[in-house]
UniProtKB/Swiss-Prot annotation:
The lineage of its organism: Bacteria, Pseudomonadati, Pseudomonadota, Alphaproteobacteria, Rhodobacterales. NDH-1 is composed of 14 different subunits. Subunits NuoA, H, J, K, L, M, N constitute the membrane sector of the complex. The keyword Cell inner membrane applies. This is NADH-quinone oxidoreductase subunit H. The gene is nuoH. Pfam families: NADHdh. It comes from Jannaschia sp. (strain CCS1). The keyword Chaperone does not apply.
Length: 346
């Protein structure tokens, strides 16, 4: 059996497919419960009960919603480009999913350990905007088109800042491999070795940029209900709409994973002496997701001009300055052992 999977082409392909399923299926199941948690957190802030009917404590509400979307009729607008219309949500979801191929959950728990994993994720996540643009253009309606234009401008604007922020971490680590980045944060001081301390300003900027990149409140301008009804998703229903929604959630969880890997030590234990493991990775991702949900519940939506001004006039200059600052500190070992512990990979 082992020889079949390791020495034959068919076995190798089946092994890759099995590995993909072992990654995608738990991720999609987790999304259902994360969506439930998101709605419960939002309800708690607004002093409501939230989902509480389907299943114990409403735990099966997300599965009921998925089933509802699947059995609904798919209504295609008159004059829509049918091929592009149906391709758009598929592109959006696939681009979000394939980025997970290089995300490690523990030592060796990764589908593909690339030396340029950071560059791969950045490139693939940049392609997600094409699904949004295709959906807005193919719908043959003004509101989806305006929403897709907003989304394209917003995602491109904040991808620049995210790229510069990640460059600062790469300079500190000397590698674009996520496993190497996590190992660079290992040490006898536990969480004091993690990059959230020396790169705290960039952690703050990365979190806000991740909200904008994934179109989460308060930066959900592409689907502003008061202005654009539902943005680029206006003319979508049933399964295509569900694919768009899942793609957005996958992108949000991906940003949570990136935040943990880059700034919070990945699967490393926060307390010296406790064993490292996937438990810490998942716990940290849940904590970051909780912050995403709280921002959605308590922060009002920005205006579009404020969003663009924040990205180009505040985040971009500051993140560029930080890259130069980190490079200078690492090159000349300023502050001696303190910065050297963080800025030259330990």
């Amino acid at each position: 059996m082992v020889e079949f999977f390791t020495q034959t082409t068919t076995g190798a392909i089946l092994l890759i497919l099995l590995q993909c399923l072992l990654l995608v299926v738990p991720l999609l199941v987790a999304l259902a419960f994360l969506m439930y948690a998101d709605r419960k957190i939002w309800a708690a802030v607004m002093m409501r009960k939230g989902p509480n009917v389907v299943g114990a404590f409403g735990l099966l509400q997300s599965f009921a919603d998925f089933l509802k979307y699947i059995v609904k009729e798919i209504v295609v607008p008159a004059g829509a480009d049918r091929a592009v219309y149906f391709l758009a949500p598929i592109v959006s979801l696939v681009m979000a999913l394939i980025a997970w191929a290089v995300i490690p959950f523990n030592d060796g728990w990764v589908l593909s350990s690339l030396n340029v994993a950071v560059l791969y994720v950045f490139a693939v996540s940049s392609l997600e905007v094409y699904g949004v643009i295709m959906g807005g253009w193919a719908s043959n309606s003004k509101y989806p088109f305006l929403g897709s234009l907003r989304s394209a401008a917003q995602m491109i604007s904040y991808e620049v800042s995210i790229g510069l922020i990640i460059i600062g971490v790469i300079i500190s680590t000397g590698s674009m491999n996520f496993t190497a980045i996590v190992h660079a944060q290992d040490g006898d001081l536990g969480l004091l070795n993690w990059y959230f301390l020396p790169h705290f300003p960039m952690l703050f900027l990365f979190f806000i940029s991740a909200l904008a990149e994934t179109n989460r409140p308060p930066f959900d301008l592409p689907e502003a209900e008061a202005e654009l009804v539902a943005g680029y998703q206006v003319e979508y229903s049933s399964t295509p709409f569900l694919l768009f929604m899942i793609g957005e959630l996958v992108a949000v969880v991906l940003m949570c994973a990136l935040t943990v890997l880059l700034f919070f030590g990945g699967w490393l234990s926060p307390i010296p002496g406790l064993p490292d493991g996937v438990f810490w990775m998942i716990l940290k991702m849940l904590a970051v997701f909780f912050m995403f949900s709280m921002v959605k519940a308590i922060v009002p939506r920005y205006r579009y001009d404020q969003l663009m001004r924040l990205g180009w006039k505040v985040f971009l200059p500051f993140s560029l300055f930080w890259v130069v600052f980190v490079a200078f500190m690492a090159r000349y070992e300023v502050l001696g052992g303190f910065w050297a512990r963080f800025a030259v990979g330990g």
